[in-house]
Amino acid sequence: MPNPFALPEGMALFTFHGRVVRGKRLGSRLGFPTANIAYDPRSRTWPREGVYVGVAQLDGESRGYVCIINQGRHPTVPEGIATVEAHLLGNAHRDLYGLELTLAYCLYLRPEQTFPSLEALREQLDRDRLSAVRWARDNAPYLLTGLDLFPHQA
């Protein structure tokens, strides 16, 4: 697959393309709306389950968004099925259902964890978001044009 993000060679650990589908909306309730992408974990070799910093690009758009990607089974609120979902920084209120989205996994942050409460999960998501912002700032000189690192943010 060609590199749709104009990322430097080797920056993306893994890329994945799929259609945004409806989820449980838990991320939205926690203040971290996500684009859920249908996938079959048996369809190919996938990276290990966990949380990643990445870049997302919607089909038809030239820019990308820094994002937090979760690939796994959500042990705090188990669904039983593996999912891929991405929280796009700076894109909190846009309806993405039905759109095609490409994700580039760029940095493995941590394994999935079971949290004692939804508040503890939300606090970890805040830390993950800060990690994503730091990654973007640290890598900004290496990212090529066309990537909106912090859309709608000062």
Outline where the language-model segments fall.
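Phosphate/ribose-recognition catalytic cores of enzymes acting on nucleotide-derived substrates
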Residues: 2-154
